[in-house]
Amino acid sequence: MKTLIAAYSGVLRGTGSSILSALQDLFSVTWLNRAKVEKQLQVISVLQWVLSFLVLGVACSVILMYTFCTDCWLIAVLYFTWLVFDWNTPKKGGRRSQWVRNWAVWRYFRDYFPIQLVKTHNLLTSRNYIFGYHPHGIMGLGAFCNFSTEATEVSKKFPGIRPYLATLAGNFRMPVLREYLMSGGICPVNRDTIDYLLSKNGSGNAIIIVVGGAAESLSSMPGKNAVTLRNRKGFVKLALRHGADLVPTYSFGENEVYKQVIFEEGSWGRWVQKKFQKYIGFAPCIFHGRGLFSSDTWGLVPYSKPITTVVGEPITIPRLERPTQQDIDLYHAMYVQALVKLFDQHKTKFGLPETEVLEVN
């Protein structure tokens, strides 16, 4: 209001310079407010995914069970009936929706960090692929944004390639959450699903496996570049059985967005985490990011740190119906070497010193 009064006063005095100055002040205030709104939209878009990841499945399960005890019980019956008939859909690649993958909310999600996808080589649509994604981080936010949405234009960068991000099969037993995940092209990380996608779904499929899994998330912390890979060879065996090329993929900055309490080996905290990992498939982490309204407080919103996912050169894999351990070890060693090479080639571009070494555990 003061700005408008100043402009009007300038008109009365006949001073054009005052009018121009007042209008400039007005536009600067408008753009400042717009920038704040934009930032809050980014924060909200990230928070909705974090909450979906953490509590949507459990919350919807509780609500659905409660609905059985209300006048709306028919809704619960209809959904459970649908669930029975649709139970195996996730194992066949799910039910992706390009509309959901192109939601504007994912662009706000991308810009919050920001997240970018770097392509180094073309992929042939006549081949199938298994991407090894590293590191896991706390939630694999880079993997989700790059391969389960179109925010970083994965379909334009790799035309004709259908990405499937693989995650815990238990997520697809959760009502509503399973629909949400499938709409983004997310599938269970189990042998049945991967066998189907690599043998009965044509060519041009790319299955993204976060190789380190829950074990790797336990060591996720800012400033650490380490992968759990030395004894992870199942994905190599699957690639050999189907002749699917292996693609090393490293996400710089994935470990920077959350801080967590690291329990020492042998401590009670680590014992609890390993038991959860063994029997349930995930390891509970004590972590924090920033608050919803301030970066100076703790909360569930990840820190705004750049995440850059670099997709490396595919390793051509022959098809062997019964690969021997020697075959698996050979191509696993080739994969590890390719991943380390990819890390070394790009580390200085994203803020790491030349002396930084990728730790392979």
Curated annotation (Swiss-Prot):
E.C. number(s) listed in UniProt: 2.3.1.20, 2.3.1.76
Reaction equations catalysed: an acyl-CoA + a 1,2-diacyl-sn-glycerol = a triacyl-sn-glycerol + CoA; all-trans-retinol + an acyl-CoA = an all-trans-retinyl ester + CoA; 2-(9Z-octadecenoyl)-glycerol + (9Z)-octadecenoyl-CoA = 1,2-di-(9Z-octadecenoyl)-sn-glycerol + CoA; 1,2-di-(9Z-octadecenoyl)-sn-glycerol + (9Z)-octadecenoyl-CoA = 1,2,3-tri-(9Z-octadecenoyl)-glycerol + CoA
BP terms from Gene Ontology: cellular response to oleic acid; cholesterol homeostasis; diacylglycerol biosynthetic process; diacylglycerol metabolic process; fat pad development; fatty acid homeostasis; glycerol metabolic process; intracellular triglyceride homeostasis
Topology relative to the membrane: Multi-pass membrane protein
Gene Ontology annotations for the cellular component aspect, listed alphabetically: endoplasmic reticulum; endoplasmic reticulum membrane; lipid droplet; membrane; perinuclear endoplasmic reticulum membrane; perinuclear region of cytoplasm
Pathway annotation from the record: Glycerolipid metabolism; triacylglycerol biosynthesis
Self-association state and partner proteins as the record states: Forms multimeric complexes consisting of several DGAT2 subunits. Interacts with SLC27A1 and this interaction is enhanced in the presence of ZFYVE1.
Cross-referenced PANTHER family: DIACYLGLYCEROL O-ACYLTRANSFERASE, DIACYLGLYCEROL O-ACYLTRANSFERASE 2
Protein name: Diacylglycerol O-acyltransferase 2
